[in-house]
Curated annotation (Swiss-Prot):
<protein>
    <recommendedName>
        <fullName>Alanine racemase</fullName>
        <ecNumber>5.1.1.1</ecNumber>
    </recommendedName>
</protein>
<feature type="binding site">
    <location>
        <position position="130"/>
    </location>
    <ligand>
        <name>substrate</name>
    </ligand>
</feature>
<dbReference type="Pfam" id="PF01168">
    <property type="entry name" value="Ala_racemase_N"/>
</dbReference>
<dbReference type="InterPro" id="IPR001608">
    <property type="entry name" value="Ala_racemase_N"/>
</dbReference>
<dbReference type="InterPro" id="IPR011079">
    <property type="entry name" value="Ala_racemase_C"/>
</dbReference>
<dbReference type="InterPro" id="IPR029066">
    <property type="entry name" value="PLP-binding_barrel"/>
</dbReference>
<comment type="function">
    <text>Catalyzes the interconversion of L-alanine and D-alanine. May also act on other amino acids.</text>
</comment>
<dbReference type="Pfam" id="PF00842">
    <property type="entry name" value="Ala_racemase_C"/>
</dbReference>
<feature type="binding site">
    <location>
        <position position="305"/>
    </location>
    <ligand>
        <name>substrate</name>
    </ligand>
</feature>
<dbReference type="GO" id="GO:0008784">
    <property type="term" value="F:alanine racemase activity"/>
</dbReference>
<feature type="modified residue" description="N6-(pyridoxal phosphate)lysine">
    <location>
        <position position="35"/>
    </location>
</feature>
<dbReference type="InterPro" id="IPR009006">
    <property type="entry name" value="Ala_racemase/Decarboxylase_C"/>
</dbReference>
<dbReference type="GO" id="GO:0005829">
    <property type="term" value="C:cytosol"/>
</dbReference>
<dbReference type="InterPro" id="IPR000821">
    <property type="entry name" value="Ala_racemase"/>
</dbReference>
<comment type="pathway">
    <text>Amino-acid biosynthesis; D-alanine biosynthesis; D-alanine from L-alanine: step 1/1.</text>
</comment>
<dbReference type="GO" id="GO:0030170">
    <property type="term" value="F:pyridoxal phosphate binding"/>
</dbReference>
<feature type="active site" description="Proton acceptor; specific for D-alanine">
    <location>
        <position position="35"/>
    </location>
</feature>
Length: 373
């Protein structure tokens, strides 16, 4: 028999989250961002639920080809553009839209000889300082791109650094509007946080990522309470052993947790080789939350490669075989991430290939039925 650990991707939750985004930005078209294999959920697994988007945004050419193989005929945006001149032929073959963010990409594009015009998104650096043309250079870059016979439509694009924080986006929107003033073309500015909290930046296209998967851009689940977003990934396992501890007994590598009273602990078939964070706290003030038999409890001790331990005090009837939820419905991934010094994005993307993954599919009645991925 296989180990009892299993991840579930919930297609109804994905479809719901796309609907939430539509309601938040009713006048914008939606790029569903599926980079990093759909934030660890799997492009194949999420496609059916997200095909109601207006387009898909990603990084990898192979993932773009996969979307075409799955039957997607709509727009696909390469968020980092291309890296080699030979990539341009594939962009044309698979009818992709490409970001252009630097002089090197413009030079490669100038040397290209595609048979038809390519759709591009010209990226403006408004303060993130990763990719994009400086505002003082942007108009010249646009004019250069506009003069190329191989360039069709040009969308103006930027990315917000603080849409989820107190600094906000006003300074970046101001820089964007100044740099693109009187230039024709649509605009794409909003990431997940801007979709939720900055409607003035929605413009023609929005690019939601983390909220498609039901987690918070801030890393705090409380910040998306009331939005209607639902977790699209859950991670489950079972207790494989139970231990009785006496005061002074310690748990796990490094003996970081010491029992202060008689207590029962459960051993769960899940460890850092499955993608659960090794740095999740099982000692001190803020221990990582876990559900056992649907009851909330906490980690004890250090997470090891294949196992972790939990306090069974709140669930005295728990036994070997009792179900465990590591994150998912009833236990937001952001809470686990906070107790691990990271963000939900990282936990999603870190789910290990050895974890069996099933899909709760969308049916005609909009109910969920399990299917093997």
């Amino acid at each position: 028999m296989p180990r009892p650990i299993q991840a579930v991707i919930h297609q109804p939750a994905l479809a719901n989250n796309l609907d939430v985004i539509r309601r938040k930005a009713p006048d914008a078209r939606v790029w569903a961002v599926v980079k990093a294999n759909a934030y660890g959920h799997g492009i194949r697994r999420v496609f059916a639920a997200l095909r109601g988007a207006d387009g898909f945004g990603l990084l990898d050419l192979n993932e773009a080809v996969l979307l075409r193989d799955l039957g997607w005929q709509g727009p696909i945006l390469l968020l980092e553009g291309f890296f080699q001149p030979q990539d341009i032929a594939l962009i044309e073959q698979y009818r992709l839209t490409t970001a252009i963010h630097c002089d090197e990409q413009l030079r490669m594009l100038e040397s290209a000889r595609p048979k038809g015009p390519l759709a591009i998104q010209l990226k403006l650096n408004t303060g993130m300082n990763r990719l994009g043309f400086h505002p003082a250079e942007y108009r010249a870059a646009w004019e250069r791109a506009r003069a190329m016979p191989c360039v069709g439509s040009i969308v103006h694009m930027t990315h917000f650094s603080d849409a989820d924080g107190p600094r906000g986006i006003a300074h970046q929107v101001e820089a964007f509007d100044a740099a693109t003033a009187n230039l024709p073309g649509e605009a794409s500015l909003s990431n997940s946080a801007a979709v939720l909290w900055h409607p003035q930046a929605h413009r023609a296209w929005v690019r939601p990522g983390i909220i498609l998967y039901g987690a918070s851009p801030t890393g705090r689940d409380a910040d998306i309470a009331g939005t209607g977003l639902q977790p699209a990934m859950s991670l489950h396992s079972e207790l494989i052993a139970v231990q009785d501890l006496q005061p002074g007994d310690t748990v796990g590598y490094g003996s970081l947790f010491t029992a202060e009273r008689p207590m029962r602990i459960g051993v769960v078939a899940c460890g850092y080789a499955d993608g659960y964070p090794r740095h999740a706290s099982g000692w001190g003030e803020q221990r990582a939350p876990v559900l056992v038999d649907g009851v909330r409890t906490e980690l004890v001790g250090r997470v090891s490669m294949d196992m972790l331990c939990v306090d069974l005090t709140p669930c005295p009837k728990a036994r070997v075989g009792s179900p465990v939820t590591l994150w998912g419905q009833g236990l937001p991934i952001d809470e686990v991430a906070q107790a691990s010094g990271t963000v939900g994005y990282e936990l999603m993307c870190a789910l290990a290939p050895r974890v069996p993954t099933t899909v709760a599919t969308i049916t005609a009645s909009d109910s969920a039925a399990p299917a093997v991925a």
